[in-house]
């Protein structure tokens, strides 16, 4: 058979690899080819079958096969080696077998005719019964390359493996898409294939760079802009220039390029606008441009009108930012404490709550002036004041703890935890505290007059600048028999009505207690009215008896005068005329209708310590009031001690004011009244004042008698408040404790009653004033005692907070408990010898903004001061 025929048959049947066709081309007759049967198109024939096939083929044509085989054996092996080296990493495959005889030098070869087959395989029969399969390239490779060259010259390079993967994608694209990059690079295809490859190698690098730039995201975004502008895509240079032009166009809308010009134009358009409304970073630029704008505006009035019109709405807009400052929680919380920002409507409230109303008014004027002033500059001044940093700062914890040491106790809304306190009573307390803080101390002068004369060591405590402090020890100190002890000399030079009050208090020993009676706030009586009445009605002989305990302020002394004292004092023999002795009985207050706090005040006014039971307080007050009225009815017969021990000072002042006669004032002016401390029994029998010498001796004797714990303590030092300082009182821990004999020793000196001023002076008064000035106020002493309290040990695992810790935690403070602690333990730690009463403690709490309550109230009637701005 013809080998060509066998070649066609094998080409149709024998495909041994997926990528290429391996053809067996023996030189035997074609019938032998038919004997070869491949198991599968992708598998090689077995060696035995090939040997059988070859053996048959060689037997048919031995001469031709031998000659050809010898030639081909040496030739093909040498020829195929270099070709196999350039193959696609396919190793030579050797098939060895032990089949029948095989003719040496036989060569089986077939060429693939299909253009898709790039490589063809050959089987070489080598002597030694081996079959070698080799791959060789077709001889007509150049012709096939020319066919592919027409489509694209890059395909050959792909076959050789010289090109990157990117080139493969380009070769697969249609010619229309390739035209753009060719146009950009301005390249032409050469006719020669080798020249094309060289040129492509050089251009591929440039195209790869450009395409890589195109692949970046930034370049992709700019490409559509170039299309919109209409740049021709033919040349890359034009496209780049178009991109740059578009960038410059877009840059006009960017922030960096336009801010300076716009800011200058705005400033030129509105030269009259205030500088505060302009950005801070553009002030210098705007100022320079404003000058040119002003010159331009002068040239044309129309521009000025337009500029003014534009500037007005801008000014209105500038007013809005300060309003937005109050949108934070901190601004709302602190707005009420900033005085400048408060409106004029709130000024009356501020004046009521503030100790210095004058300052509030000034602030109100400032705010009103700021509102009236509409110009931008004035308004900016007010805004600068408002924008000033607050007084308080957020400091580190260590500095905050240090600040507590030097900080006075002042608390805000904690005082409103208990709300039982009525507004009327609060206003009354505010007024009394304000008066007490003032230098005049007018409402307190009554108690001050009685307490001022005694020495600093005398009984009673002068509570400086605290009206309630005068109330606790206002009752006179008494001995075992109930007689009132005399007090030191008092200077009443400040008021002409003071000596008359003292005359109404006939007994020198009684004067001490009478003078220290309840201040107007505690007694809840209009002392001013009651004071004026008794002064007009005082008899001249009665003035002599009263020389004992007048205070420097006549108004208070009037109130303090007790009818019992007047009755008991029968020193001059002249009796005080009482208009109607039954009136005090009619004026008997209904103690059951009083609040517990009011009852406690009245009990404290008599010199008794606080009583827990409300019923006991009512019974005690009723008994004291009845005893006082009885003594007033039988004035000439009563002993000094009987009525004084249970007298209500506030009511005594009223009764005296009604019954005293005014004739006594001129007579007392010319007379010298010796301060007498006669024995209580002697005063009863005599009814006439004893000379000063005798009074001194009797006072010494009475001192010894009066040194007993049963007498009631009196606040003698309240008189010193008029001078501005408090006198250290002896500690009256028992309500019945008597005044110390020191009071008598200081009082036995005679008083000189001047004509019109009616002032009683003693040589010891200046010394008392100087000594009292050195003493610190009880308010500061209370603060120091509370801070000096050490930490308490836990009781049964429960912590016991100190008073200072309770205040910091806004716990309502019980006035009675705090007063007891101060009198027992608190003042001892700081070396204070004076004592305080719950009323004084309440005044201290109100001044410091501490929430305080009375013991039995349980928050119903809480005496908590409102927050003071």
Curated annotation (Swiss-Prot):
<comment type="function">
    <text>Regulatory subunit of the SLX1-SLX4 structure-specific endonuclease that resolves DNA secondary structures generated during DNA repair and recombination. Has endonuclease activity towards branched DNA substrates, introducing single-strand cuts in duplex DNA close to junctions with ss-DNA.</text>
</comment>
<feature type="region of interest" description="Disordered">
    <location>
        <begin position="40"/>
        <end position="79"/>
    </location>
</feature>
<feature type="compositionally biased region" description="Polar residues">
    <location>
        <begin position="165"/>
        <end position="174"/>
    </location>
</feature>
<dbReference type="InterPro" id="IPR027784">
    <property type="entry name" value="Slx4_ascomycetes"/>
</dbReference>
<feature type="region of interest" description="Disordered">
    <location>
        <begin position="165"/>
        <end position="199"/>
    </location>
</feature>
<feature type="compositionally biased region" description="Basic and acidic residues">
    <location>
        <begin position="63"/>
        <end position="79"/>
    </location>
</feature>
<comment type="similarity">
    <text>Belongs to the SLX4 family.</text>
</comment>
<dbReference type="InterPro" id="IPR018574">
    <property type="entry name" value="Structure-sp_endonuc_su_Slx4"/>
</dbReference>
<feature type="compositionally biased region" description="Low complexity">
    <location>
        <begin position="40"/>
        <end position="59"/>
    </location>
</feature>
<keyword id="KW-0234">DNA repair</keyword>
<dbReference type="GO" id="GO:0006260">
    <property type="term" value="P:DNA replication"/>
</dbReference>
<dbReference type="GO" id="GO:0017108">
    <property type="term" value="F:5'-flap endonuclease activity"/>
</dbReference>
<comment type="subunit">
    <text>Forms a heterodimer with SLX1.</text>
</comment>
<protein>
    <recommendedName>
        <fullName>Structure-specific endonuclease subunit SLX4</fullName>
    </recommendedName>
</protein>
<keyword id="KW-0227">DNA damage</keyword>
<dbReference type="GO" id="GO:0006310">
    <property type="term" value="P:DNA recombination"/>
</dbReference>
<feature type="compositionally biased region" description="Polar residues">
    <location>
        <begin position="765"/>
        <end position="774"/>
    </location>
</feature>
<feature type="region of interest" description="Disordered">
    <location>
        <begin position="630"/>
        <end position="774"/>
    </location>
</feature>
<dbReference type="GO" id="GO:0033557">
    <property type="term" value="C:Slx1-Slx4 complex"/>
</dbReference>
<feature type="region of interest" description="Disordered">
    <location>
        <begin position="92"/>
        <end position="116"/>
    </location>
</feature>
<feature type="region of interest" description="Disordered">
    <location>
        <begin position="351"/>
        <end position="388"/>
    </location>
</feature>
<feature type="region of interest" description="Disordered">
    <location>
        <begin position="293"/>
        <end position="323"/>
    </location>
</feature>
<keyword id="KW-0539">Nucleus</keyword>
<feature type="compositionally biased region" description="Polar residues">
    <location>
        <begin position="294"/>
        <end position="311"/>
    </location>
</feature>
<keyword id="KW-0597">Phosphoprotein</keyword>
<feature type="compositionally biased region" description="Polar residues">
    <location>
        <begin position="664"/>
        <end position="673"/>
    </location>
</feature>
<feature type="region of interest" description="Disordered">
    <location>
        <begin position="418"/>
        <end position="437"/>
    </location>
</feature>
<feature type="compositionally biased region" description="Low complexity">
    <location>
        <begin position="688"/>
        <end position="700"/>
    </location>
</feature>
<dbReference type="GO" id="GO:0006281">
    <property type="term" value="P:DNA repair"/>
</dbReference>
<feature type="compositionally biased region" description="Basic residues">
    <location>
        <begin position="312"/>
        <end position="322"/>
    </location>
</feature>
<keyword id="KW-0233">DNA recombination</keyword>
<feature type="compositionally biased region" description="Polar residues">
    <location>
        <begin position="647"/>
        <end position="657"/>
    </location>
</feature>
<dbReference type="Pfam" id="PF09494">
    <property type="entry name" value="Slx4"/>
</dbReference>
């Amino acid at each position: 058979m013809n080998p060509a025929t066998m070649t066609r048959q094998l080409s149709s049947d024998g495909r041994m690899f997926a990528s290429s066709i391996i053809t067996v081309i023996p030189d035997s007759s074609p019938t032998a080819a038919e004997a070869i049967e491949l198991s599968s198109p992708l598998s090689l024939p077995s060696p035995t079958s090939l040997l059988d096939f070859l053996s048959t083929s060689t037997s048919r044509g031995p001469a031709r096969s031998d000659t050809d085989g010898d030639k081909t054996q040496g030739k093909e092996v040498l020829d195929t080696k270099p070709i196999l080296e350039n193959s696609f990493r396919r190793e030579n495959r050797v098939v060895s077998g032990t089949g029948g005889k095989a003719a040496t030098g036989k060569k089986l070869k077939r060429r693939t005719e299909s253009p898709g087959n790039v490589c063809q395989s050959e089987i070489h029969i080598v002597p030694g019964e081996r079959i070698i399969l080799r791959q060789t390239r077709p001889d007509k490779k150049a012709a096939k390359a020319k066919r592919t060259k027409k489509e694209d010259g890059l395909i050959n390079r792909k076959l050789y493996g010289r090109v990157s993967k990117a080139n493969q994608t380009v070769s697969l694209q249609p010619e229309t898409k390739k035209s753009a990059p060719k146009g950009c690079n301005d390249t032409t295809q050469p006719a020669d294939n080798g020249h094309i490859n060289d040129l492509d190698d050089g251009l591929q690098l440039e195209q790869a760079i450009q395409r890589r730039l195109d692949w970046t995201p930034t370049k992709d975004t700019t490409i559509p802009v170039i299309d919109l502008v209409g740049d021709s895509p033919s040349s890359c240079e034009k496209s780049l220039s178009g991109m740059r032009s578009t960038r410059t166009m877009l840059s006009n809308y960017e922030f960096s390029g336009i801010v300076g010009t716009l800011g200058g134009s705005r400033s030129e358009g509105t030269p009259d606008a205030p500088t505060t409304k302009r950005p801070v970073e553009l002030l210098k630029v705007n100022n320079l441009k404003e000058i040119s704008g002003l010159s331009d505006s002068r040239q044309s009035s129309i521009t000025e009108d337009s500029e003014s019109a534009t500037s007005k709405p801008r000014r209105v807009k500038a007013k809005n930012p300060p309003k937005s400052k109050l949108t934070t929680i901190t601004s709302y919380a602190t707005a009420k404490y900033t005085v400048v920002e408060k409106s004029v409507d709130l000024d009356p409230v501020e004046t009521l709550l503030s100790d210095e109303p004058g300052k509030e008014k000034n602030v109100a004027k400032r705010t009103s002036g700021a509102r009236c002033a509409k110009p931008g500059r004035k308004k900016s001044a007010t805004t600068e004041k408002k924008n000033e940093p607050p007084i308080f700062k957020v400091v580190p914890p260590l500095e905050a703890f240090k600040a507590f040491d030097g900080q006075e106790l002042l608390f805000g809304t904690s005082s409103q935890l208990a709300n039982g306190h009525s507004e009327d009573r609060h206003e009354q307390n505010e007024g009394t505290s304000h008066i007490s803080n003032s230098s005049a101390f007018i409402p307190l002068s009554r108690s001050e007059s009685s307490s001022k004369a005694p020495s600093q060591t005398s009984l009673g405590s002068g509570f400086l600048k605290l009206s309630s402090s005068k109330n606790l020890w206002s009752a006179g100190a008494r001995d075992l028999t109930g007689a009132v002890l005399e007090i030191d000399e008092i200077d009443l030079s400040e008021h002409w009505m003071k000596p008359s009050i003292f005359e109404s208090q006939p007994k020198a020993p009684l004067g001490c207690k009478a003078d220290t009676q309840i201040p107007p706030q505690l007694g809840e009586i209009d002392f001013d009215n009651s004071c004026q009445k008794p002064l007009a009605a005082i008899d001249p002989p009665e003035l002599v008896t009263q020389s004992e305990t007048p205070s420097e302020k006549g108004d208070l002394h009037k109130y303090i005068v007790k009818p019992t004292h007047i009755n008991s004092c029968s020193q001059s023999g002249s009796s005080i005329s009482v208009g109607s002795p039954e009136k005090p009985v009619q004026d008997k207050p209904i103690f059951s209708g009083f609040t517990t706090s009011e009852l406690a005040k009245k009990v404290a006014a008599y010199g008794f310590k606080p009583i827990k039971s409300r019923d006991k307080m009512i019974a005690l007050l009723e008994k004291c009031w009845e005893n006082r009225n009885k003594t007033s009815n039988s004035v000439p017969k009563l002993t000094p001690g009987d009525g004084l021990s249970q007298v209500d000072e506030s009511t005594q002042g009223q009764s005296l004011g009604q019954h005293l006669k005014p004739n006594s004032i001129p007579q007392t002016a010319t007379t010298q009244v010796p301060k007498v401390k006669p024995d209580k029994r002697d005063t009863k029998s005599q009814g006439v004042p004893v000379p000063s010498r005798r009074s001194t001796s009797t006072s010494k004797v009475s001192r010894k008698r009066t040194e007993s714990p049963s007498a009631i303590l009196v606040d003698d030092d309240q008189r010193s408040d008029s001078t501005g300082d408090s006198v250290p009182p002896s500690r009256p821990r028992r309500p019945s404790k008597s005044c110390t004999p020191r009071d008598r020793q200081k009082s036995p000196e005679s008083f000189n009653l001047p004509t019109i001023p009616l002032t009683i002076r003693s040589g010891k008064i200046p010394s008392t004033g100087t000594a009292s000035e050195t003493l610190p106020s009880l308010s500061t002493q209370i603060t120091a005692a509370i801070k000096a309290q050490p930490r308490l040990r836990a009781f049964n695992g429960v912590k016991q907070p100190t008073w200072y810790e309770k205040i910091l935690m806004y716990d309502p403070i019980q006035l009675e408990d705090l007063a007891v602690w101060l009198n027992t333990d608190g003042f001892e730690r700081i070396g204070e010898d004076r004592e305080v009463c719950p009323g004084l403690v309440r005044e201290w709490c109100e001044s410091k903004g501490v929430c305080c309550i009375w013991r039995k109230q349980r928050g119903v009637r809480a005496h908590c001061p409102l927050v003071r701005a």
